């Protein structure tokens, strides 16, 4: 710095999902301070923070080829996760790891999701209040991107209009669906109510509860397939996600 102070930081290149060959900034992380007060974290001056992310894959897998995408708030977290899990998951090297460098922006999320909807999205943000909010925002943006792939026809429009922005496609007004789909949803709903009743009663054997849960899940799968067919949604674009969290009491992965 101009005042003579020197710092040693790790720098992680930021790229835009549609052009990972062009570096648009740097995510910077410093060493932990000796007094335990934390460490420097930020982005290099001039970085494209609204669109740029750290995108990495040990096997050089591209976003469009990936079957698994792992989302983190920092590159440190992504590396820590890989070190913790790679010995027991040899395919992990084929995954793509993403760092948003903090609060994920709409442009960051949409840039990745539009190229990787068929992949399973692993949401690995921190477990503090900010991380919980980031996870919620990513889920909502995923639902928006899925919705954007559907052609709105006169037959589909009433139901699609009933789905609140940022919500799952199954959260619309079921009464606006064709008769067969309403019936299919009714089977799932009845199975769900039975499973919840069995769990809460304390009177049912775990094997019986598991059997009823399997029936419930099978009925939902049948309904979801029918919903996709009605909406003209390609199964590959019906994005899925899983929330992964570090072991308590750790709030992050490093």
Description of each model-found segment:
Residues 1-49:
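Basic, glycine-enriched DNA-binding surface that flanks or lies within the catalytic cores of DNA
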Residues 11-14, 70, 98:
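Cytosolic beta-strand hydrophobic patch enriched in CBS
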Residues 38-66:
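Glycine-/acidic-rich phosphate or pyrophosphate-binding loops and their flanking alpha/beta elements
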Residues 65-69, 121:
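Short active-site oxyanion
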Residues 73-74, 127:
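Helix N-cap/beta->alpha junction signal
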Residues 77:
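Conserved Rossmann-like nucleotide-cofactor binding loop
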Residues 85-254:
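TOPRIM fold recognition
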């Amino acid at each position: 710095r101009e005042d003579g102070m020197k710092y040693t930081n790790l720098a992680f290149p930021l790229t835009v999902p549609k052009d990972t060959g062009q570096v648009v900034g740097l995510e910077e992380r410093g060493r932990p301070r000796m007094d335990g007060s934390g460490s420097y974290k930020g982005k290099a001056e001039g970085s494209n923070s609204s669109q740029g992310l750290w995108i990495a894959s040990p096997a050089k897998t591209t976003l469009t080829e990936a079957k698994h995408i792992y989302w983190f708030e920092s590159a440190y977290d992504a590396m820590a996760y890989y070190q913790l899990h790679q010995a027991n998951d040899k395919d992990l090297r084929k995954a793509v790891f993403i760092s948003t460098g903090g609060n994920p922006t709409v442009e960051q999320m949409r840039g990745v999701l539009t190229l990787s909807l068929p992949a399973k999205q692993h949401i690995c943000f921190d477990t503090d209040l900010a991380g919980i909010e980031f996870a919620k925002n990513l889920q909502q943006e995923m639902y928006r991107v899925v919705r954007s792939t559907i052609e709105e026809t006169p037959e589909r429009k009433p139901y699609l209009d009933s789905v609140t922005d940022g919500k799952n496609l199954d959260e619309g007004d079921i009464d606006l669906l064709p008769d067969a789909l309403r019936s299919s949803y009714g089977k799932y709903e009845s199975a769900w109510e039975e499973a919840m009743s069995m769990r809460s009663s304390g009177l049912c054997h775990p094997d019986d509860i598991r059997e009823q849960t399997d029936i419930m899940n099978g009925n939902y799968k049948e309904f979801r397939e029918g919903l996709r067919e009605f909406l003209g949604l390609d199964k590959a674009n019906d994005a899925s996600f899983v929330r992964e969290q570090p072991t308590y009491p750790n709030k992050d992965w490093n």
